Amino acid sequence: MESMTMIILQSLIIFITILFFKKQKRGKKSNTPRSPPRLPLIGNLHQLGHHPHRSLCSLSHRYGPLMLLHLGRVPVLVVSSADVARDILKTHDRVFASRPRSKLFEKLFYDGRDVAFAPYGEYWRQIKSVCVLRLLSNKMVTSFRNVRQEEISLMMEKIQKSSSLQVNVSELLGSLTNDVISRIALGRKYSGETDSKELMKRLMMLMGEFSVGTYVPWLGWIDWISGLDGQLNKTGNDLDEFLEKVVQDHVDGDGQRTDFVDVLLRIQREKSIGFEIDRLCIKAIVLDVLVAGTDSSYALMDWAMTELLRHPECLRTLQEEVRTICKGNLSVSEEDIQNMSYLKAVIKETTRLHPPLPLLAPHESIQDVILGDYHIPAGTQVMINAWAIGREAATWGPDAEKFRPERHLDSSVDFRGHNFELVPFGAGRRICPAISFAVVLIEVALANFVHRYDWKLPEDSKENQTNVAESTGMVIHRLFPLYAIASSTT
């Protein structure tokens, strides 16, 4: 009896597999982009690997700059060229302006009440307007200049105390961005509080986790077995408790500060925008700022220093520019950096090779659309592979894999959403609204880093320190911390 049951089961599996591949073969005749072969149930999930941006780039060389994957039951377009990115983010920007639902972001970001992951619609338009006009305007960016300068001065003092010894560059830059963003968004630093630091680490780690249930709903129990559901619930609750305390402290305060929480509470009290924001909305917006402002800026500065130490001639050129413009001054001001063209080229080149989110936050189509020669149904997800676009030889030339800031000196290409060959912050309606906010910190911090100190790699670990191995996760960092030796020039 048991042997007969096994024969029936095996026959059934073979029959289902044959039907699946016949259906897939027929599907190839439909007017959709090319797809890699997929497996039953999981589709192309097995082809993502530990570094999906690299795996998808390799697949695009075979299946084209616009290819269709099936991640479980979810159809996903993968974009790997500037031309296709332009079609998605400009020509059909409104159609692809929404975000897909995700268990991770629902649990951690107040069920899409934030700016980054809210679905496209009136609510998203209103809160984006609040962020752009009231929190991230040029006036607000300038108003926090003293905060940036104070924290950079403290960082310089830490380096001075470690002069001629190995400096953990990664740790320094991480602390700097965390302290600056905390003061601007929350009104004070939290870097000395172990619980809040561990909470943010847990959040960053979970954002890079894979939820099986999001793509294969009937296998959602795997998220429970693996502990992901429990981690999401605990971290989401802990985040809410932390942010609730922060907001309540501001409510109980004098209201005279100008950090982001106070600005949002003032908007709530005055009802001055024709749109009511509630407590959850305030916490969601603040969480966006903490996550995006801290992790992305830190990653970019860390990669910039890595590339400069890997290419000493570029480091010398940058130091010569900074020291010439700031001759006689101990520090670099934000006015000084306006004239530093090579500094800006270094940062552009870093974003090209090391976009902090190599796969931009996913988009989703809100209606059927014709994209080139293809019919794309409503509800199709889109992954923009910024990492692949930044290394596209057709755009950047045969040395596209090489760090060469000079390529930007006579180029008008920028990362502010008008040039689709460089999209580390996205483009179109969903472009990161905090570009200016992030870039000014990166520029002035990096300029001060190289102005007062000469940097070199430890002789006993040069190979390890110049390694560009990547971490896993949504934001890509160095796999190992960067150490270097600083020697003062004064």
UniProtKB/Swiss-Prot annotation:
EC number: 1.14.-.-
GO molecular function terms noted in the UniProt entry: heme binding; iron ion binding; monooxygenase activity; oxidoreductase activity, acting on paired donors, with incorporation or reduction of molecular oxygen
Binding site for heme: C432
Keywords: Heme, Iron, Membrane, Metal-binding, Monooxygenase, Oxidoreductase, Transmembrane, Transmembrane helix
Gene3D superfamilies for the chain: Cytochrome P450
Transmembrane regions listed in the UniProt entry: 1-21
Compartments (UniProt record): Membrane
InterPro entries on file: Cyt_P450, Cyt_P450_CS, Cyt_P450_E_grp-I, Cyt_P450_sf
Cofactors named for this entry: heme
One Pfam family hit: p450
Membrane topology: Single-pass membrane protein
Cellular component terms per the entry's GO annotation: membrane
Family as reported in the entry's similarity comment: Belongs to the cytochrome P450 family.
Entry protein name: Cytochrome P450 71A21
Species whose genome carries this gene: Arabidopsis thaliana (Mouse-ear cress)
Encoding gene (name): CYP71A21
